[in-house]
Curated annotation (Swiss-Prot):
The organism of origin for this protein: Oryza sativa subsp. japonica
Name this protein carries in UniProt: Protein argonaute 16
Any one GO cellular component localisation term in the record: nucleus
Family: Belongs to the argonaute family. Ago subfamily.
Function: Probably involved in the RNA silencing pathway. May bind to short RNAs such as microRNAs (miRNAs) or short interfering RNAs (siRNAs), and represses the translation of mRNAs which are complementary to them.
Keywords from the UniProt entry: RNA-mediated gene silencing
Domain Piwi: 535-844
GO function terms (MF aspect): RNA binding; RNA endonuclease activity
GO biological process: regulatory ncRNA-mediated gene silencing
SMART domains: DUF1785 (SM01163), PAZ (SM00949), Piwi (SM00950)
Amino acid sequence: MAAKIGEIVQVHNDNPVKRVPIARPSFGREGKQIKLLSNHFTVKLSGIDAVFYQYSVSIKSEDDKVIDGKGIGRKVMDKVLQTYSSELAGKEFAYDGEKCLFTVGPLPQNNFEFTVILEETSSRAAGGSLGHGSPNQGDKKRSKCTHLAKKIVVGISYAAKIPLKSVALALQGSESDHAQDALRVLDIVLRQQQAKRGCLLVRQSFFSDDFRNLVDLTGGVSGCRGLHSSFRTTIGGLSLNMDVSTTMIVTPGPVFDFLLTNQNVRDIRDIDWPRAKKMLKNLRVKAIHNNMEFKIIGLSDEPCSRQTFPMKVRNGSSEGETVEITVQEYFKSKQVDLTMPYLPCLDVGKPKRPNYVPIELCHMVSLQRYTKALSSQQRATLVEKSRQKPQERMRVVTDAVKNNRYDDDPILSSCGIKIEKQLTRVDGRVLSAPTLVVGNSEDCIPNRGRWNYNNKRLFEPVKIERWAIVNFSARCDMSRISRDLINCGRTKGIIIERPFTLVDEDSQSRRCTPVVRVESMFEKVKANLPGPPEFLLCVLPERKNCDLYGPWKKKNLHEMGIITQCIVPSVKMNDQYYTNVLLKINAKLGGMNSKLSLEHRHMIPIVNQTPTLILGMDVSHGSPGRADVPSIAAVVGSRCWPLISRYRASVRTQSPKVEMIDSLFKPLDDGKDDGIIRELLLDFYKTSQQRKPKQIIIFRDGVSESQFSQVLNVELNQIIKAYQYMDQGPIPKFTVIIAQKNHHTKLFQENTPDNVPPGTVVDSGIVHPRQYDFYMYAHAGPIGTSRPTHYHVLLDEIGFLPDDVQKLVLSLSYVYQRSTTAISVVAPICYAHLAAAQMGQFMKFEEFAETSSGSGGVPSSSGAVVPELPRLHADVCSSMFFC
């Protein structure tokens, strides 16, 4: 396939037909039957004639200023219901906490205006002051002027009708405009119930401050275990999906304890205060001397003993005079002796009106979400301590449904909604694992999703001749690593010559920046090698996620074109450890560890008969709280058809937090296409005997149901444009499959404590009433409760039978070259995720804000300039560098 020269051709109609997700054609039949339980609870819906009335809510102060402080809305609306129940005809309502209110049936009139007064004076809600006994500018005056001490004007106006009958129609498989809206109202009813109990609400999950739910993650952060609940339309009827959920919160307790653990110091005097200021900003604290809550905006410039503020002192009947007083003196006058006056104060006022309170008098408010990125150690602790065995999870969710007493809710009752208290039973099928082929064309049959290379050779081992080991670790025996790696490779069929050189980092370089350390190491490598190596083994320091990783990968893959494998010294550097390392090295250097038996014998249904390109697509976003970090879009494409085990990656940056990939087709001013798909199409053509793909199977990760239409009508259109620009022949047939891991459906075996066996597929009972979806457990779950991948087939022009789609998905979970286990999602998606993560290390994202206005960037869909990723060197761009 050759790129077309010249102007971009017209590639589609001006008004293309909008694609919609296809309906389920039929059900799968193959596999051994298995009885399962799901964490869905059947919902009986008898009041289908009920109609939800939606009303818009506005909350303003007397002077017409909008009040939108967090938590105010629910308090105000509770007061409205309490005060004006008769005007509202005694109707209960569901309120989303912001601008929408819902009732069953209409209110007496379409528009209301109510006035309420809240007697609470919480600074958290109103942005007020510390109140009596606290140093600030205009102390007494400000204590009387919080928003909540004033009258609040509430406007309620009719917005829309949402018939509950729409849910019944959706359950019958009909398209319904209001079904999702009605389900959202039902979810809001459950959220409101938990809000009244004081729970933290995070989307459709809720969390209480019961200490038994907390897991200390160190650093002042705790994992908080709660519950997720959502109503779902399924082929078996309406259901309530209830699952265990976890979020991160700031560990409640004294602020100085939080600072000590957050910065891992023992003495409060060792605190890095600029860092503390950044961490504390916008967190809420409660002052123990007056029991009021405040939001932190910063720290004082001076410690309590020296930080002054003006205070008006009255003398008899005169106006009095203003004097400067320190925070410490002020509190002493109020009979509060500070024990740590050398600490700065928390500023809980406003930017131009500071309001100081000593740190030692403040405690962190409970249930504050922690939205910053966790460290690798915190993540590991969270995963380890959040695990629940299947039987325990079943008990927790069942108890939750029983204890929440949903049947007593007046709104649910008025809709005729009754929720069963038992887990829903579903039928599943266990598909047979695909047979693999290893060295000497020997068959390897996985057992419960696992296999090994004991006494086996790799299917296509490479030979490594020109290589070296570089050592950034202070404690490492490179000679032993070299010897053990060579010996292990020999047993797996990989011939590894002795390394040309073993290069240690000198002690002086260890004090330099990561980039300088990498450059110095490369100078030493070049001085000790007669030519460029084909492979470098890099020993990193003991610490994971070390700062050297990104610069090292960029130097090798972008500048030098050298395949590299990084390892971290481990206590257990045994044969299994070296085998796992060699699996990655062999795949990166062009070898193949195993392949499917069907692939080896050219017997993969449909894919084998017609040139077929398989794409895996994913977008990785910056860590929480980093809205300035570009997202990274990665697409991998299969190569060397009819193989489905080899892939090449293409990666681009795009606007932060944007999920839709905008660089699949990327026409330039010179008439060329610099998009991702062109790169992968050319590679397929070159490696597949100059064949063009006549079928393209797309696996897309990371999109929600609300984005399905964009995948079908935006991303797919880009792919078609890229193909038509290169070739004006027939457009390939497409099959588009979404893979979702971020859902809350779990399945359990009924009579055993074990997880669901690998190969289990469910396409009945709890699946969509109309759309073409199924749940697949391709992997084994040895610990915790395993989660299935939820696959949605949005388009199938190729014409797979359901059994063929499900077997293809299962097979693609066994071609992941990095491991000897089946993985939970198809390998192309995992590879795309790995490619995005590794290429993301190429750039220092914290510098993006400074560089985005300079050269080398490309305009994003929002108009802002997003810096481009450095491209891979020509010598490695077609490799599986991401393994």
